[in-house]
Design a protein with these regions (language model features):
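N-terminal subdomain of lithium-sensitive/metallo-dependent phosphomonoesterases centered on the IMPase/IPPase/PAP
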Residues: 1-93, 114, 173, 177-180, ...
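Conserved beta-strand termini and adjacent loop/short-helix elements that scaffold enzyme active sites
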Residues: 71, 167, 190, 233-235
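Acidic beta-strand-loop-alpha-helix segment within the catalytic core
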Residues: 110-197, 245-259
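Residue-level signal for inorganic ion chemistry
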Residues: 24, 48, 59, 96, ...
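Glycine-rich active-site/cofactor-binding loop and its immediate structural neighborhood
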Residues: 84-128
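Oxyanion/phosphate-interacting regions
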Residues: 1-15, 21, 177-181, 196-259
Length: 259
């Protein structure tokens, strides 16, 4: 993909995500690993730091002039960020709680944001050895150890049971209120950005997120949902989520659904 003076080879980004996943698995497969709590009480492990360092180094080698915003470098000021037209937005380890629980439902997320929209997204699930890829103007795809397939969202048909994906770690009253509006539904619990990817590949119709998330939690999978024919919309304005438009890096509540 050509972005102004930058030629982006998505295969290189896939390789970066997989390399970060391998680094995470080295720590995941140890008998024990260190973790601590950040200021917001979210967990931080040595795997988060190792993956962050690897991704930052590799992206700086591939695109030395494109800035990088990571969950682990979120202290970068709005005064600096608002000058960015194009930047990498990464979550080195999304689903740290799932990582600590050792249920395998965590991901590496790398997105390229251009003019506030996610135009490239790679989500890699190291334990599952599955990778989802979205690139603006091209079909979304899912890569496994067996094959690579084009993926598409699945529209809901009248009378059909809604398949709704929800957070394994953050389900709450807001989700229950949302579900009351649906006549028939089946709830699928999942961790990390895999939830958005399930909508992208047609395994779920909806993912309502009516609780706090940050921009690095959604950007990569958002690009994949877009490429698969879906959308990620603000629950209040019904407009697509945008990135780096304000001082706060918090997302509004949102819904992931087919177009």
């Amino acid at each position: 993909m050509q972005i102004e003076e930058h030629e982006i080879d998505v295969n290189k980004i896939i390789n970066v995500a997989k390399a970060a996943g391998d680094k995470i698995l080295e720590i995941y497969n140890k008998e024990s690993f260190d973790h601590q709590l950040k200021i917001d009480n979210s967990p931080l492990t040595e795997a988060d730091i190792a993956a962050h360092n690897l991704i930052q180094q590799r992206l700086e080698e591939i695109t030395p002039t494109i800035p990088i915003l990571s969950e682990e470098s979120s202290f970068i000021s709005w005064q600096e960020r608002k000058q960015w037209k194009c930047y990498w937005l990464i979550d080195p380890l999304d689903g740290t709680k799932e990582f600590i629980k050792k249920n395998g439902e965590f991901t590496v997320n790398i997105a390229l944001i251009y003019q506030n929209d996610p135009i490239i997204g790679v989500v890699h699930a190291p334990v599952l050895n599955e990778t989802w890829v979205g690139e603006q103007g091209k079909p979304a795809k899912k890569i496994t150890q067996f094959d690579t397939k084009i993926i598409k969202v699945k529209p809901h048909n009248r009378g059909e049971v809604y398949k709704v994906v929800g957070s394994r770690s953050h389900a709450g009253d807001s989700l229950n209120e949302f579900l009351k509006e649906l006549e028939k539904y089946e709830l699928v619990s999942m961790g990390s950005s895999i939830k958005l990817c399930l909508v992208a590949e047609g395994k779920a119709h909806l993912y309502p997120r009516l609780g706090p998330t940050s921009e690095w939690d959604t950007a990569a999978a958002h690009a994949i949902v877009n490429a698969a024919g879906g959308k990620v919309i603000d629950n209040e304005t019904q407009m697509p989520l945008q990135y780096n438009t304000k001082d706060s890096l918090r997302n509004p509540h949102f819904i992931v659904q087919p177009n």
